[in-house]
């Protein structure tokens, strides 16, 4: 079923993207490429689109390879692309909603804003 495929894509992509993102924060050579994304001073819905080309190629490339190798349907892929675009827009939006019931399993705007902040804990961990 389509819903199962979309859920599987979300899980595979989220796992992969999490580790790619952590790598951008942890590897000094890669950080300058990702730092472009963190250079936004006032978060708004377009902040998620502020990316260096190297960041885009590595993140999307490494995230999409397992999705394509696993052979999901075109409909499931299209649904995933829509969901991930909406989610990126939402977490970068100029709101600080916490969504307490789900904030431990889903990145919320409040958490992602903290991740982009200048606080030492946020800038040193950069886990979002």
What is each residue range found by the language model?
Residues 2-128:
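Membrane-embedded catalytic scaffold of the fatty acid hydroxylase/desaturase
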């Amino acid at each position: 079923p389509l819903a199962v495929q979309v859920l599987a894509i979300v899980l595979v992509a989220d796992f992969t993207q999490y580790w790619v993102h952590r790598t951008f924060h942890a590897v000094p050579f890669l950080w300058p490429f990702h730092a472009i994304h963190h250079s936004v001073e006032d978060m708004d819905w377009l902040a998620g689109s502020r990316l260096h080309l190297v960041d885009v190629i590595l993140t999307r490339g490494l995230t999409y390879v397992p999705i394509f190798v696993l052979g999901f349907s075109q409909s499931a892929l299209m649904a995933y692309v829509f969901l991930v675009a909406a989610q990126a827009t939402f977490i970068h939006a100029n709101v600080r909603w916490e969504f307490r019931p789900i904030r431990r399993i889903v990145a919320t705007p409040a958490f992602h804003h903290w991740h982009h902040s200048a606080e030492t804990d946020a800038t040193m961990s950069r886990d979002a």
